[in-house]
Amino acid sequence: AVDKSKLATDIELALRDVLFNFSKATVRPESYSKLDLAAQIIKSSQGGTYLLIGHTDKKGTDAYNLALSRARAAEVVKELEKRGVDPSQIKSKGMGEAEAKVAETASDEERLQDRKVQVKYVLDSEWDSIPKNDIPTKLIIKK
């Protein structure tokens, strides 16, 4: 049997260096190969449902960062679906800066480690209670 938690870690590692421009939700082109790899891992996982959790650094307001992290995680899901991942296998959620560790005053390069997407394997019993994404319908984020 395939260890889905281990696969979640592999997917997360593949997505570790997916880069976004500051304050934007669009994935930068140099990150496309990482998305290709993550998509391959998910497609070979023989089922398995994965929650992609977006995180931001501490710069900006809590509310703004929460919205941005939601948009970024949803964008990664969209990019993976474009690469053939079954939409029923992936969902997204944003955490904003809740788990950011680097100070707001640190350099952009230092804060980069807080801007990431985490991947969690979710059991079927829990999966149905999680929405596809947590983006409020009225909110518009710059692309």
Region spans (language model):
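Periplasmic peptidoglycan-binding/tethering modules of Gram-negative envelope proteins
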Residues: A1-T49, D108-E109, V122-K143
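Short leucine-rich amphipathic alpha-helices used at interfaces
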Residues: D3-K4, T9, G60-T61, A67, ...
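Short, surface-exposed beta-strand segments enriched in small/polar/acidic residues
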Residues: E12-S23, L35-A73, E79, P87-E104
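Periplasmic OmpA/Pal-like peptidoglycan-binding modules at the C-termini of bacterial envelope proteins
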Residues: G48, A74, K78-K143
